[in-house]
Amino acid sequence: MRTRRRTAALAATLALAAAWAGSANATEKPEELVVQKMPPWHPHEIYIVDISMPSMTDGRIYVYDADAKKLLGQIDGGFGPGFAIAPDRKASVVATTYFSRGSHSTRTDVVEIIDNTTLDHAGEIVIPAKHAQHVPSPYNTAFSADGKRLYVANITPAASVTVIDAVSKKVLSEIDTAACVLAYPGDNDRFTALCESGKALTVTLDANGKEAKRTMSDAFIDVDKDPAFVNASRYKGDYLFTTYGGNVRSADFSGDKPAFGKPWSLLTDAERAEGWRPGGMQQTAVQAKQNRYYVLMHKGTDGSHKDPGTQVWVYDLKSKQRVARWDLTQQKVEPLVSIQVSEDDKPLFYGLTATSDLVVMDARTGALQHVEKQIGNTSSLLVNP
């Protein structure tokens, strides 16, 4: 009898062990990894470029949904990334540098192509190892209006621009820009670079992407008395350049010879005497549908042009008059270093603080909507496709 009981108990134990083992094996089955697709694009999707000063070989681009108030994903940026979104929004590019030993040894510069539906790496183009490595600018890496050409600014310290066929994904040429920097796209076959003299160099390309013609303008910026910020804002085909002293001048780079508008002031004499002036890293933004110009302002002196803005001044670009003045401290918002505005019927205003907080406000009223804490290490450029 005891033998039967022991046998039955042993059988039950073995059956239980087998069942447990089967269950364990079932739960430990490797999970199949999938890449989720991005939600459909909408105008309140903002890209945030971070050069990542504490670890500069590991720059990042973050994608944020301001309606859902959540981070959608990130793109690897490498060292000193230049970033641009194709006009059709289907892809982005990152012009960057990699070293074979992480932070040193053999250098390779590439333009990486990103599929915007997944944020996956979709290919790369090896470019001359001259890509300019500096605080991100919208004109370090830029598409032509039709998206068929891509311009990448180089500094070695000699200045040049690499011209790329974005369709065939091939380098077409490298244009010596004679100490003039960055690449402001004009018509589909030309770009303009800014010169230290305050002049503008426009290069016209032939059908093969080679230089066909170049034109140097007269100085439109007084670099000694009133230098201008290089991060100009686009408005109806023109570029709006704002100076350290608070003046604005439009530049039309669409033709083979640049044309410039008459300067106008952001400040009254009394405001200028009080020390108000523009500042920050990405100091201005345009909302073309409403003809609005947003400018970061602070009280400062000569040399304070990179100081963050404690206020946002809003101008009507038709009348060139200020229509609003937002004091950020009244909403307990930290000073902003960079700004951007969405281009839609219910526009949002975006700002970055010095600690990489993303501030979202109603672009029509200035009412605070949300603050997303610390997106990145040293984020400084906002791109709204």
List each language-model region with its residue ranges:
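Asp-box/WD-like beta-propeller blade repeats and closely related beta-sheet repeat scaffolds
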Residues: 119-162, 166-184
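Short, conserved, GDST-rich strand-edge loop motifs in beta-rich repeat architectures
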Residues: 40-53, 94-108, 295-309
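Short coil/turn segments that connect the beta-strands within blades of beta-propeller domains
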Residues: 43-45, 88-91, 146-148, 188-190, ...
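Loop/turn-rich, solvent-exposed surfaces of beta-rich toroidal or solenoidal domains
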Residues: 276-321, 325-345
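Short glycine/acidic-enriched loop and turn motifs that connect beta-strands
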Residues: 52-56, 98-103, 157-158, 198-200, ...
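A short beta-strand motif characteristic of beta-propeller blades
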Residues: 28-33, 68-75, 79-81, 120-132, ...
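Short loop/turn segments that connect beta-strands within beta-propeller blades
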Residues: 65-68, 116-118, 165-169, 205-208, ...
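Repeated scaffold domains used in trafficking and secretory/extracellular systems
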Residues: 29-38, 77-88, 132-142, 177-188, ...
